Amino acid sequence: AVMRKILNDGEQAFLEKMSRLPDGTWRDRTYVECSRPGDRKTHRVQLTLHKRGNSLIFENDGTAEQDGAMNATFSGWRGSIMVALNQLLCWDQYFAIGGALRHVVFDPSPGTMNCANFPASVSTAPVQAMEISLYPAYNVLSKMIYTDPGMRQDIMCIGGTSQWPATIFRGQDQWGDPYGYLLVDPIGGAIGAFATGDGISTGGQSRTPICKLPNIEH
C-alpha cells in the first residue's frame, strides 16, 4: 500500500506539471567519436521528444548505426533518459519516477549506437553511449520546461564534460601487487548554468549526490 501511494502521488505531481506545459516537439543532437582504435569519424546521437497531452514520447531516430565498442542497448538509452526525467521533473517526489513512467513512451530505433542489437560490443557503454545519450535528454526536457515561468527555475545546463573521458590504466606496484585506476576528472568538473544563476565550478555530476570531489583551495 505504501509503495502504491508513492507511485500514485508521484503520478499526480507529474500530471500537474504536464498540465502546465504545451504540446509540441523538441529535438537535440550531439556527436561522439572514437568507437574503436583508429576511428576518426563522428557518430551522431539524436533525441526527439513529443508531448501529447499528458504523454511524453522519446525517439532516437537519426542516431548513428551501432559501431565499434561504444554501443549501448535499449536499457542504457532508456536509463539515460530516466536520469534527466527524474532530475528535472520528479525531484520533488524524492526521485520516485515510477508514477511518471506510466505516461512515458520510449520508441527506439534498433541497430543504432544507443539501442544496439546483438552482438554489438557494449564494453564502454556507460562512459560513451549512455553518457552521450543523457545530455540531449536534459536539453529537450529543458526546452519543454522553459515555457512555464514557475518551472523554469528547475532548468540546468549539462555538466562540464560532453562525454566521460575515461583513462584507465593498471599494472603492478612497488610491492608486486596489482593495481588499477580510473581517472575521475569529470567528477570534479563543472555543473552547467541554471536558469536563475551561474553554474558550480567544481560541482561534479549533479545527477548524484555522491559524485563530488573536495575543493583543495578551501
For every predicted segment, state its role.
Residues A1-H218:
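Glycine/proline-enriched, intrinsically flexible loops and inter-domain linkers
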